[in-house]
Swiss-Prot record:
Its main location: cytoplasm. It comes from the Bacteria. This is Acetate kinase. The gene is ackA. InterPro entries: Ac/propionate_kinase, Aliphatic_acid_kin_short-chain, Aliphatic_acid_kinase_CS, ATPase_NBD. Pfam families: Acetate_kinase. It comes from Exiguobacterium sibiricum (strain DSM 17290 / CCUG 55495 / CIP 109462 / JCM 13490 / 255-15).
Amino acid sequence: MAKIMAVNAGSSSLKFQLLEMPNETMIAVGLVERVGKDDAIFTIKYGEGQKFTDVLPLATHKEAVELSLEKLMEFGIISSYDEIKGVGHRVLHGKEKYADSVIITEDVMQDIESYTELGPLHIPPNLIGIRAFQAILPNVPQVAVFDTAFHQTMPEENFLYSLPYEYYTEYGIRKYGFHGTSHKYVTERASELLGRPLQDLRLISCHLGSGASIAAVAGGESIDTTMGFTPLEGITMGTRSGSLDPALIPFLMEKTGKTAEDVLNVMNKESGIYGLSGLSSDLRDVQTAAKEGNHRSEMALRIFANRIHGYIGQYAAEMNGVDAIIFTAGVGENSDSIRERVLRGLEFMGVYWDPSLNNGARGEELFINYPHSPVKVIIIPTNEELMIARDTVRVGGLVEQNA
Protein backbone atom coordinates (compact mmCIF):
# COMPACT_ATOMS: atom_id res chain seq x y z
CA MET A 1 0.00 0.00 0.00
CA ALA A 2 1.17 3.54 -0.75
CA LYS A 3 -0.35 6.92 -0.03
CA ILE A 4 -0.30 9.16 -3.11
CA MET A 5 -1.22 12.85 -3.36
CA ALA A 6 -2.93 14.12 -6.50
CA VAL A 7 -2.50 17.87 -6.85
CA ASN A 8 -4.09 20.57 -9.01
CA ALA A 9 -2.58 24.01 -8.40
CA GLY A 10 -4.48 27.00 -9.80
CA SER A 11 -3.53 30.67 -9.87
CA SER A 12 -5.01 31.28 -6.42
CA SER A 13 -6.00 27.78 -5.34
CA LEU A 14 -4.65 24.37 -4.42
CA LYS A 15 -6.77 21.23 -4.71
CA PHE A 16 -5.52 17.89 -3.49
CA GLN A 17 -6.59 14.34 -2.78
CA LEU A 18 -4.76 11.75 -0.72
CA LEU A 19 -5.40 8.25 -2.01
CA GLU A 20 -4.28 4.84 -0.88
CA MET A 21 -3.00 2.79 -3.77
CA PRO A 22 -3.40 0.33 -5.35
CA ASN A 23 -6.82 -0.20 -3.74
CA GLU A 24 -7.76 3.34 -4.88
CA THR A 25 -9.30 4.44 -1.59
CA MET A 26 -9.73 8.18 -1.10
CA ILE A 27 -8.41 9.10 2.35
CA ALA A 28 -8.78 12.88 2.27
CA VAL A 29 -9.72 15.68 -0.09
CA GLY A 30 -8.67 19.28 0.41
CA LEU A 31 -9.08 22.70 -1.14
CA VAL A 32 -7.24 25.94 -0.44
CA GLU A 33 -8.91 29.00 -1.98
CA ARG A 34 -7.78 32.64 -2.20
CA VAL A 35 -4.06 31.82 -1.88
CA GLY A 36 -2.13 35.10 -1.61
CA LYS A 37 -4.89 36.77 0.43
CA ASP A 38 -5.31 37.49 4.13
CA ASP A 39 -8.59 35.56 4.13
CA ALA A 40 -7.57 32.34 2.38
CA ILE A 41 -10.00 29.47 2.96
CA PHE A 42 -8.72 25.99 3.83
CA THR A 43 -11.14 23.04 3.71
CA ILE A 44 -10.42 19.36 4.25
CA LYS A 45 -12.77 16.35 4.30
CA TYR A 46 -11.67 13.00 5.65
CA GLY A 47 -12.73 9.88 7.53
CA GLU A 48 -16.43 9.22 8.03
CA GLY A 49 -17.72 12.57 6.86
CA GLN A 50 -15.45 14.75 8.99
CA LYS A 51 -14.85 18.26 7.68
CA PHE A 52 -12.62 21.11 8.84
CA THR A 53 -12.63 24.68 7.51
CA ASP A 54 -10.42 27.62 8.47
CA VAL A 55 -9.94 31.18 7.23
CA LEU A 56 -6.40 32.51 7.58
CA PRO A 57 -3.70 34.48 5.74
CA LEU A 58 -1.72 32.40 3.23
CA ALA A 59 0.77 34.41 1.20
CA THR A 60 2.09 31.67 -1.09
CA HIS A 61 1.35 28.23 -2.52
CA LYS A 62 4.25 26.92 -0.41
CA GLU A 63 2.40 28.05 2.72
CA ALA A 64 -0.76 26.37 1.39
CA VAL A 65 1.15 23.10 0.86
CA GLU A 66 2.72 23.33 4.33
CA LEU A 67 -0.70 23.91 5.92
CA SER A 68 -2.26 21.02 3.98
CA LEU A 69 0.43 18.58 5.10
CA GLU A 70 0.33 19.86 8.69
CA LYS A 71 -3.44 19.28 8.84
CA LEU A 72 -3.03 15.75 7.45
CA MET A 73 -0.74 15.11 10.43
CA GLU A 74 -2.87 17.00 12.97
CA PHE A 75 -6.01 15.02 12.15
CA GLY A 76 -4.16 11.69 12.21
CA ILE A 77 -4.68 11.09 8.50
CA ILE A 78 -0.94 10.45 8.24
CA SER A 79 1.51 9.93 11.10
CA SER A 80 4.56 11.06 9.13
CA TYR A 81 5.36 12.79 5.85
CA ASP A 82 7.26 9.60 4.99
CA GLU A 83 3.90 7.88 4.43
CA ILE A 84 3.43 9.93 1.25
CA LYS A 85 5.19 7.88 -1.42
CA GLY A 86 4.45 10.02 -4.48
CA VAL A 87 2.88 13.30 -5.60
CA GLY A 88 1.14 13.63 -8.97
CA HIS A 89 0.63 17.09 -10.43
CA ARG A 90 -1.89 18.09 -13.06
CA VAL A 91 0.03 20.10 -15.69
CA LEU A 92 -1.80 21.92 -18.46
CA HIS A 93 0.60 21.43 -21.36
CA GLY A 94 3.22 18.94 -22.50
CA LYS A 95 3.30 19.89 -26.20
CA GLU A 96 4.34 17.01 -28.48
CA LYS A 97 7.29 15.98 -26.32
CA TYR A 98 5.20 14.51 -23.53
CA ALA A 99 2.74 11.87 -24.72
CA ASP A 100 2.70 10.30 -21.25
CA SER A 101 3.15 11.27 -17.63
CA VAL A 102 6.77 11.59 -16.44
CA ILE A 103 8.88 11.81 -13.31
CA ILE A 104 9.64 15.50 -12.81
CA THR A 105 13.32 16.37 -13.20
CA GLU A 106 14.89 19.80 -13.57
CA ASP A 107 14.89 19.29 -17.35
CA VAL A 108 11.16 18.54 -17.27
CA MET A 109 10.59 21.68 -15.18
CA GLN A 110 12.47 23.75 -17.76
CA ASP A 111 10.36 22.27 -20.55
CA ILE A 112 7.12 23.03 -18.71
CA GLU A 113 8.30 26.58 -18.04
CA SER A 114 9.07 27.04 -21.74
CA TYR A 115 5.43 26.16 -22.53
CA THR A 116 4.13 29.10 -20.46
CA GLU A 117 3.14 31.10 -23.56
CA LEU A 118 0.71 28.28 -24.43
CA GLY A 119 -0.95 28.44 -21.02
CA PRO A 120 -0.11 31.73 -19.29
CA LEU A 121 -2.95 31.39 -16.77
CA HIS A 122 -2.36 27.76 -15.85
CA ILE A 123 1.32 26.85 -16.21
CA PRO A 124 2.84 29.33 -13.70
CA PRO A 125 0.68 28.02 -10.82
CA ASN A 126 1.35 24.43 -11.99
CA LEU A 127 5.07 25.14 -11.57
CA ILE A 128 4.59 26.90 -8.23
CA GLY A 129 2.68 23.88 -6.91
CA ILE A 130 5.43 21.50 -8.01
CA ARG A 131 8.17 23.65 -6.46
CA ALA A 132 6.25 23.88 -3.19
CA PHE A 133 5.91 20.10 -2.86
CA GLN A 134 9.53 19.56 -3.94
CA ALA A 135 10.69 21.89 -1.16
CA ILE A 136 8.72 20.10 1.56
CA LEU A 137 8.97 16.51 0.26
CA PRO A 138 12.37 16.58 -1.50
CA ASN A 139 12.86 12.80 -1.56
CA VAL A 140 9.37 11.90 -2.79
CA PRO A 141 8.87 11.20 -6.52
CA GLN A 142 6.92 14.00 -8.21
CA VAL A 143 5.07 13.12 -11.42
CA ALA A 144 3.70 15.48 -14.08
CA VAL A 145 0.38 14.37 -15.58
CA PHE A 146 -0.28 16.42 -18.71
CA ASP A 147 -3.75 17.49 -19.85
CA THR A 148 -2.55 17.24 -23.45
CA ALA A 149 -0.83 13.83 -23.32
CA PHE A 150 -3.86 11.65 -24.08
CA HIS A 151 -4.50 13.49 -27.35
CA GLN A 152 -1.00 12.92 -28.76
CA THR A 153 -2.39 9.90 -30.64
CA MET A 154 -4.42 12.16 -32.97
CA PRO A 155 -3.51 11.71 -36.66
CA GLU A 156 -2.13 14.61 -38.71
CA GLU A 157 -5.41 15.13 -40.54
CA ASN A 158 -7.03 15.97 -37.21
CA PHE A 159 -4.31 17.92 -35.40
CA LEU A 160 -2.94 20.10 -38.21
CA TYR A 161 -4.50 23.45 -39.08
CA SER A 162 -4.74 24.44 -42.74
CA LEU A 163 -2.02 27.07 -42.38
CA PRO A 164 1.45 27.17 -43.97
CA TYR A 165 3.13 23.97 -42.78
CA GLU A 166 6.13 25.97 -41.54
CA TYR A 167 3.98 27.43 -38.76
CA TYR A 168 3.67 23.91 -37.38
CA THR A 169 7.34 22.98 -37.74
CA GLU A 170 8.68 26.33 -36.49
CA TYR A 171 6.15 27.39 -33.86
CA GLY A 172 4.37 24.17 -32.91
CA ILE A 173 1.01 25.53 -34.07
CA ARG A 174 -1.41 22.60 -34.07
CA LYS A 175 -4.38 21.21 -32.17
CA TYR A 176 -3.26 19.85 -28.79
CA GLY A 177 -6.53 19.20 -26.98
CA PHE A 178 -7.14 19.30 -23.24
CA HIS A 179 -9.10 17.50 -20.49
CA GLY A 180 -7.06 14.45 -21.54
CA THR A 181 -6.88 13.01 -18.03
CA SER A 182 -10.68 13.12 -17.73
CA HIS A 183 -11.31 11.69 -21.20
CA LYS A 184 -8.84 8.88 -20.49
CA TYR A 185 -10.48 8.02 -17.16
CA VAL A 186 -14.07 7.90 -18.40
CA THR A 187 -13.28 5.93 -21.56
CA GLU A 188 -11.36 3.32 -19.56
CA ARG A 189 -14.25 3.17 -17.09
CA ALA A 190 -16.75 2.84 -19.96
CA SER A 191 -14.85 -0.22 -21.19
CA GLU A 192 -15.25 -1.79 -17.73
CA LEU A 193 -18.95 -0.94 -17.53
CA LEU A 194 -19.61 -2.25 -21.04
CA GLY A 195 -17.63 -5.42 -20.37
CA ARG A 196 -15.75 -5.00 -23.63
CA PRO A 197 -12.05 -4.44 -24.40
CA LEU A 198 -11.18 -0.78 -24.89
CA GLN A 199 -9.37 -1.75 -28.10
CA ASP A 200 -12.71 -2.80 -29.63
CA LEU A 201 -14.67 0.34 -28.74
CA ARG A 202 -15.53 3.60 -30.49
CA LEU A 203 -16.43 6.13 -27.81
CA ILE A 204 -17.47 9.78 -27.74
CA SER A 205 -16.60 11.43 -24.44
CA CYS A 206 -18.42 14.67 -23.56
CA HIS A 207 -16.64 16.51 -20.73
CA LEU A 208 -19.14 19.26 -20.00
CA GLY A 209 -18.25 21.71 -17.24
CA SER A 210 -17.49 25.43 -17.20
CA GLY A 211 -14.74 24.39 -19.57
CA ALA A 212 -15.99 21.77 -22.01
CA SER A 213 -14.60 19.48 -24.66
CA ILE A 214 -15.53 16.37 -26.60
CA ALA A 215 -13.18 13.59 -27.66
CA ALA A 216 -13.46 10.81 -30.21
CA VAL A 217 -11.71 7.75 -28.77
CA ALA A 218 -11.20 4.69 -30.98
CA GLY A 219 -9.41 1.61 -29.69
CA GLY A 220 -8.49 3.45 -26.51
CA GLU A 221 -6.75 6.27 -28.39
CA SER A 222 -7.90 9.85 -28.88
CA ILE A 223 -8.28 10.47 -32.60
CA ASP A 224 -9.93 13.90 -32.40
CA THR A 225 -11.04 16.47 -29.85
CA THR A 226 -12.76 19.84 -29.87
CA MET A 227 -10.25 21.99 -27.97
CA GLY A 228 -7.30 23.10 -30.05
CA PHE A 229 -4.05 25.05 -29.76
CA THR A 230 -5.62 26.51 -26.63
CA PRO A 231 -8.72 25.60 -24.58
CA LEU A 232 -10.61 28.41 -26.38
CA GLU A 233 -11.38 26.32 -29.47
CA GLY A 234 -14.36 23.98 -29.74
CA ILE A 235 -17.85 24.08 -28.32
CA THR A 236 -19.53 26.98 -26.50
CA MET A 237 -18.46 27.01 -22.83
CA GLY A 238 -19.25 28.88 -19.62
CA THR A 239 -17.35 32.05 -20.53
CA ARG A 240 -15.43 30.93 -23.65
CA SER A 241 -16.77 31.48 -27.15
CA GLY A 242 -15.51 28.24 -28.63
CA SER A 243 -14.71 28.15 -32.35
CA LEU A 244 -15.50 31.20 -34.46
CA ASP A 245 -14.25 33.01 -37.57
CA PRO A 246 -10.71 34.30 -36.81
CA ALA A 247 -11.39 37.35 -39.00
CA LEU A 248 -13.59 38.56 -36.14
CA ILE A 249 -10.50 39.49 -34.12
CA PRO A 250 -9.20 42.32 -36.37
CA PHE A 251 -12.81 43.34 -37.11
CA LEU A 252 -13.58 43.76 -33.40
CA MET A 253 -10.27 45.53 -32.81
CA GLU A 254 -11.24 48.10 -35.43
CA LYS A 255 -14.83 48.49 -34.24
CA THR A 256 -14.19 48.61 -30.49
CA GLY A 257 -10.67 50.02 -30.26
CA LYS A 258 -9.62 47.01 -28.23
CA THR A 259 -6.21 45.37 -28.56
CA ALA A 260 -5.86 41.77 -29.74
CA GLU A 261 -5.25 40.78 -26.13
CA ASP A 262 -8.42 42.60 -25.06
CA VAL A 263 -10.49 40.80 -27.71
CA LEU A 264 -9.04 37.43 -26.69
CA ASN A 265 -9.90 38.27 -23.10
CA VAL A 266 -13.51 38.89 -24.14
CA MET A 267 -13.58 35.57 -26.00
CA ASN A 268 -12.13 33.74 -22.98
CA LYS A 269 -13.90 35.44 -20.08
CA GLU A 270 -16.98 37.33 -21.32
CA SER A 271 -18.41 35.06 -24.01
CA GLY A 272 -19.98 31.60 -24.14
CA ILE A 273 -23.08 30.97 -22.04
CA TYR A 274 -22.35 34.15 -20.08
CA GLY A 275 -22.02 36.38 -23.14
CA LEU A 276 -25.04 34.92 -24.91
CA SER A 277 -27.37 34.98 -21.91
CA GLY A 278 -26.06 38.23 -20.43
CA LEU A 279 -26.83 36.62 -17.11
CA SER A 280 -24.40 34.00 -15.85
CA SER A 281 -21.82 31.40 -16.83
CA ASP A 282 -23.54 28.92 -14.49
CA LEU A 283 -25.94 26.78 -16.49
CA ARG A 284 -28.21 26.32 -13.48
CA ASP A 285 -28.93 30.06 -13.36
CA VAL A 286 -29.42 30.17 -17.12
CA GLN A 287 -31.77 27.17 -17.06
CA THR A 288 -33.87 28.80 -14.35
CA ALA A 289 -34.13 32.00 -16.39
CA ALA A 290 -35.01 30.03 -19.54
CA LYS A 291 -37.87 28.30 -17.71
CA GLU A 292 -39.14 31.74 -16.72
CA GLY A 293 -39.27 32.76 -20.37
CA ASN A 294 -35.94 34.56 -20.79
CA HIS A 295 -35.24 34.32 -24.54
CA ARG A 296 -31.48 34.91 -24.40
CA SER A 297 -31.05 32.21 -21.77
CA GLU A 298 -33.06 29.72 -23.82
CA MET A 299 -31.05 30.66 -26.91
CA ALA A 300 -27.76 30.13 -25.03
CA LEU A 301 -28.86 26.65 -23.97
CA ARG A 302 -29.89 25.77 -27.53
CA ILE A 303 -26.55 26.93 -28.91
CA PHE A 304 -24.60 25.04 -26.23
CA ALA A 305 -26.48 21.79 -26.85
CA ASN A 306 -26.49 22.18 -30.64
CA ARG A 307 -22.70 22.45 -30.81
CA ILE A 308 -22.31 19.24 -28.79
CA HIS A 309 -25.01 17.48 -30.84
CA GLY A 310 -23.16 18.40 -34.04
CA TYR A 311 -19.77 17.16 -32.84
CA ILE A 312 -21.29 13.82 -31.81
CA GLY A 313 -22.44 13.39 -35.41
CA GLN A 314 -19.04 14.46 -36.75
CA TYR A 315 -17.10 12.12 -34.50
CA ALA A 316 -19.40 9.19 -35.23
CA ALA A 317 -18.64 9.80 -38.92
CA GLU A 318 -14.88 10.02 -38.26
CA MET A 319 -14.91 6.67 -36.45
CA ASN A 320 -17.38 5.07 -38.91
CA GLY A 321 -19.78 4.49 -36.06
CA VAL A 322 -19.95 4.74 -32.29
CA ASP A 323 -20.55 2.21 -29.52
CA ALA A 324 -21.22 4.57 -26.61
CA ILE A 325 -21.63 8.25 -25.76
CA ILE A 326 -20.30 9.32 -22.35
CA PHE A 327 -21.42 12.35 -20.33
CA THR A 328 -19.07 13.58 -17.61
CA ALA A 329 -18.00 16.64 -15.55
CA GLY A 330 -20.31 19.02 -13.69
CA VAL A 331 -22.91 19.64 -16.40
CA GLY A 332 -22.61 16.26 -18.12
CA GLU A 333 -23.04 14.38 -14.86
CA ASN A 334 -25.76 16.51 -13.29
CA SER A 335 -27.93 18.21 -15.94
CA ASP A 336 -30.64 15.92 -17.27
CA SER A 337 -32.09 18.73 -19.38
CA ILE A 338 -28.79 19.41 -21.18
CA ARG A 339 -28.33 15.68 -21.85
CA GLU A 340 -31.87 15.60 -23.26
CA ARG A 341 -31.20 18.57 -25.55
CA VAL A 342 -27.98 16.95 -26.81
CA LEU A 343 -29.44 13.48 -27.38
CA ARG A 344 -32.75 14.52 -28.93
CA GLY A 345 -32.79 13.54 -32.61
CA LEU A 346 -29.85 11.14 -32.54
CA GLU A 347 -32.10 8.11 -33.06
CA PHE A 348 -31.07 8.10 -36.73
CA MET A 349 -27.62 6.87 -35.66
CA GLY A 350 -28.86 4.25 -33.23
CA VAL A 351 -29.09 6.32 -30.04
CA TYR A 352 -32.25 5.37 -28.16
CA TRP A 353 -32.18 7.03 -24.76
CA ASP A 354 -34.71 6.49 -21.99
CA PRO A 355 -36.17 9.74 -20.55
CA SER A 356 -37.23 7.94 -17.36
CA LEU A 357 -33.61 6.95 -16.68
CA ASN A 358 -32.19 10.33 -17.69
CA ASN A 359 -34.59 12.44 -15.64
CA GLY A 360 -33.16 13.16 -12.22
CA ALA A 361 -29.91 11.26 -12.82
CA ARG A 362 -27.15 13.20 -11.09
CA GLY A 363 -23.56 12.36 -10.31
CA GLU A 364 -23.87 8.58 -10.54
CA GLU A 365 -22.67 5.94 -12.97
CA LEU A 366 -25.71 5.05 -15.02
CA PHE A 367 -26.73 3.75 -18.43
CA ILE A 368 -29.57 5.97 -19.68
CA ASN A 369 -30.30 4.12 -22.93
CA TYR A 370 -33.03 1.60 -23.69
CA PRO A 371 -31.73 -2.01 -23.60
CA HIS A 372 -32.20 -2.41 -27.37
CA SER A 373 -30.21 0.75 -28.22
CA PRO A 374 -27.24 -0.11 -30.49
CA VAL A 375 -25.40 2.93 -29.09
CA LYS A 376 -25.15 3.02 -25.31
CA VAL A 377 -25.38 6.30 -23.37
CA ILE A 378 -23.52 6.40 -20.05
CA ILE A 379 -23.15 8.96 -17.29
CA ILE A 380 -19.71 8.52 -15.71
CA PRO A 381 -18.55 10.94 -12.99
CA THR A 382 -14.99 11.87 -13.85
CA ASN A 383 -12.15 11.23 -11.43
CA GLU A 384 -9.07 13.05 -12.65
CA GLU A 385 -7.41 12.73 -9.24
CA LEU A 386 -7.62 8.94 -9.36
CA MET A 387 -6.14 8.97 -12.87
CA ILE A 388 -3.31 11.20 -11.62
CA ALA A 389 -2.69 8.81 -8.71
CA ARG A 390 -2.68 5.79 -11.04
CA ASP A 391 -0.16 7.47 -13.32
CA THR A 392 1.99 8.49 -10.35
CA VAL A 393 2.10 4.87 -9.20
CA ARG A 394 2.76 3.54 -12.71
CA VAL A 395 5.41 6.06 -13.75
CA GLY A 396 7.04 6.11 -10.32
CA GLY A 397 7.04 2.30 -10.10
CA LEU A 398 5.68 2.64 -6.59
CA VAL A 399 3.38 -0.37 -6.04
CA GLU A 400 1.83 -3.16 -8.05
CA GLN A 401 -1.49 -1.90 -9.39
CA ASN A 402 -4.64 -3.99 -9.27
CA ALA A 403 -5.13 -6.12 -12.35
